[in-house]
Amino acid sequence: MKFRLSLMMFLEYFVPGATVPVLSLYLKNHLHFPAYQVGEILAMPALAGFLAPFFMSHIADRSISSERLLGLCHLLAAGTMIILARQTEFLPFLALFCVYGLLFTPTFGLTNAIALHHVPDARRDFGGIRMWGTAGWVVVAWAFGYFWLRGGLGDDRLPHALYVSAFTSCVLAAYSFTLPRSHVRAVDRSTLMYWNALRVFAQPGLILLCVLTFVNSMVHQFYYFGMSPFLSQLGYRGSYIMPAMSIGQISEVVVLGLLGACLARIGIKRAMIIGAFAQGLRYIAFAVGEPTGLILAAIATHGVCYAFFFTAGYIYIDRHSTPETRAGAQQIFTI
């Protein structure tokens, strides 16, 4: 079962790995949108991601199993992405990207919930499974970002990233329907919507976790969507940007593989403090801006920043969830 969950994670992160590192360049250099429009478009997944988990937290493992819901979300997201790849005007692109965010963003919480449901020991096993998601990101960064983009002229191959993402979503949709269902006991359908999942966060420690995650997530978005134009401004060619950013994902693979042992030794809370501290250090390095070795070293700290804070946070939430509230709690935490 660990292999099947690892493959699910590989495909899940292959999907955004094809688009996120180059999306801002695609909007700016290929579609020639001004900077303020690029910013508005990139904000859409965050807005959609804020709304979608409330709905998903109610139906996941209640009206439909998490595995089936994951497949449905990816199938619809793939269709939306194909349409999106054909858009050249700002308003249609903005609207469709918001729809895509509504469909795709909840899949992060769903894959976490599915993996956490099936593993016997979340603290020991989850990091090793989640590691393969990052491996998927690294593979597409090199296969598409370096080998494919390098063979094109200028930015003419950037639109292909959207089609790669859509195709992988279709593959994952089909694969999701073959996964064993997460069986939970029946719940009272008359229960107030979201109440059981929201009650998970009523504890003071989890409230503090959500506040810290909110702040850290705001900073983290600059890495995902701002690094490609930042590296481009520093003189990196388009075909080298995704491989350069994949250094962070390679370090993430290593840290995730060691996460279980690290959490057993230092605990979740200390790990999250280290992750937040590393986040601050790397942005200081980015602000300095040179030499190249410092920038690449700062990118390499991504593994500690992400795994020690965000992945540890998912495990912490799972510790305080029941099988009935697991999927909903993961969705709400994704906000």
Walk through the language-model features, giving the residues of each.
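Helix-to-loop junctions at the C-terminal end of transmembrane segments
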Residues: 51-65, 148-152, 254-268
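Conserved MFS/SLC helix-loop-helix module at the cytosolic interface between two early adjacent transmembrane helices
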Residues: 51-88
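Structural signature of the two symmetry-related core transmembrane helices
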Residues: 68-82, 270-285
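C-terminal membrane-cytosol helix-exit motif in multi-pass small-molecule transporters
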Residues: 144-148, 161, 166-185
